[in-house]
């Protein structure tokens, strides 16, 4: 997938799936499973993963543009997407000895069948 194709796919997901339900999802606190499914089907969940595992092999410029496009339609989904890409990058950065375990996970991510994330906690603050 090229930069242009990724941005076009992000615009399609944003206009067709995100924008119509963003306001209602914000009001009700609903998580948009449809948005994640659309991102997976579009190939955007594997945006920065290497071609060898089925990803698009694209870089930070495309990631930033895609994320901004999603955020214009639904900031919550853009945040989920951001955390997914960072989670996938963390998995990708696993030590080489973990390669037999990591490769199948990366292939699932690139195929749009796995959503990643990260969890953060700050000392002195309760975790939810």
What residues fall within each predicted segment?
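Glycine-rich flavin
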Residues: 33-41, 46-128
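N-terminal capping segment at the start of a domain
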Residues: 14-23
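Short, flexible segments with low predicted structural confidence
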Residues: 9-12, 42
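N-terminal hydrophobic or amphipathic helices/low-complexity stretches enriched
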Residues: 1-6, 10
């Amino acid at each position: 997938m090229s930069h242009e194709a990724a941005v076009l796919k992000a615009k399609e997901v944003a206009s067709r799936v995100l924008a119509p339900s963003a306001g209602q999802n914000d009001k009700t606190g609903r998580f948009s499973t449809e948005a994640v499914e659309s991102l997976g089907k579009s190939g955007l969940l594997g945006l920065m993963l290497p071609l060898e595992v089925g990803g698009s092999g694209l870089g930070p410029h495309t990631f930033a543009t895609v994320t901004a496009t999603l955020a214009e339609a639904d900031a919550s989904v853009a945040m989920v997407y951001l955390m997914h890409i960072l989670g996938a990058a963390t998995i990708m950065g696993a030590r080489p000895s973990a390669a037999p375990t990591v490769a199948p996970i990366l292939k699932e991510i690139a195929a749009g069948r796995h959503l990643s994330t990260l969890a953060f906690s700050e000392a002195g603050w309760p975790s939810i």
